[in-house]
Amino acid sequence: MLLYRLGKIIHVNKKYIIFESDSAGYTINITRAENFEKDRTLKLYIYELSNEYQKTLYGFTHFKERVLFEDLISINGIGPRIALILLNDGWEKIASLIANGNWETLSRYPYINVKNCHQIIFELQNKWAKFLEKDEKVPSANIQNISDATETLKMLGFKREQIKYALESANLQDDVETLVENAIKKISTVNGKEARN
């Protein structure tokens, strides 16, 4: 799974950037072009959408924005175009609308109907209410980060055995985002070795 790349922004357009990473250039669709500056070096969270005809990349500056994009396009009737329109208003705002069940405001966005909004709320409200609740709380101990990372990895589709293996030697001082990234790397490394054997 491609989660992120480290690289440099070569060009910024209203709808996409050209991103250079490991001596290769990528055209990556984005939200909120004002968040991207030419010649800036950054970690870009990437979602890769592939079919038999083409591969399209979508880039995000925040991990949870990537997760929300993936959640939105999993809803019947919500494609990447509509998901980007929603996220262009700020992922935190859209996540809050979903968590609070505010389908009326969601229905005011272009190309999205009331049926779509009800489906989004039905399928995603509980998940994002928990996500946002965790953001608002200050953990009483670093072990809470392990718990949050475990839940995030479950939401991303990893199996319990994979998660246990990936987090058993984790650094408790790491934040949730770092724990998740390192866990995915560890799982991917093991999968790669198994594929070669």
Swiss-Prot record:
InterPro entries recorded: DNA_helicase_Holl-junc_RuvA_I (IPR013849), NA-bd_OB-fold (IPR012340), RuvA (IPR000085), RuvA_2-like (IPR010994), RuvA_C (IPR011114)
Protein keywords: Cytoplasm, DNA damage, DNA recombination, DNA repair, DNA-binding
Subcellular location: Cytoplasm
Region entry Domain II, spans: 62-136
Region feature (Domain III): 141-197
GO biological-process terms attached to the record: DNA recombination; DNA repair
Top-level taxon of origin: Bacteria
Keyword DNA-binding among UniProt keywords: yes
UniProt region (Domain I), positions on chain: 1-61
Any Pfam family hit: HHH_5
Chain spans, region Flexible linker: 136-140
Principal subcellular localisation of the protein: cytoplasm
Cellular component per GO, a single term: cytoplasm
Molecular-function GO term, any one: four-way junction DNA binding
Record-annotated disulphide pairs: none
Family according to the record: Belongs to the RuvA family.
Oligomeric and partner information: Homotetramer. Forms an RuvA(8)-RuvB(12)-Holliday junction (HJ) complex. HJ DNA is sandwiched between 2 RuvA tetramers; dsDNA enters through RuvA and exits via RuvB. An RuvB hexamer assembles on each DNA strand where it exits the tetramer. Each RuvB hexamer is contacted by two RuvA subunits (via domain III) on 2 adjacent RuvB subunits; this complex drives branch migration. In the full resolvosome a probable DNA-RuvA(4)-RuvB(12)-RuvC(2) complex forms which resolves the HJ.
Function: The RuvA-RuvB-RuvC complex processes Holliday junction (HJ) DNA during genetic recombination and DNA repair, while the RuvA-RuvB complex plays an important role in the rescue of blocked DNA replication forks via replication fork reversal (RFR). RuvA specifically binds to HJ cruciform DNA, conferring on it an open structure. The RuvB hexamer acts as an ATP-dependent pump, pulling dsDNA into and through the RuvAB complex. HJ branch migration allows RuvC to scan DNA until it finds its consensus sequence, where it cleaves and resolves the cruciform DNA.
Free-text comment about domains: Has three domains with a flexible linker between the domains II and III and assumes an 'L' shape. Domain III is highly mobile and contacts RuvB.
Protein name, UniProt field: Holliday junction branch migration complex subunit RuvA
Higher taxonomy: Bacteria, Bacillati, Mycoplasmatota, Mycoplasmoidales, Metamycoplasmataceae
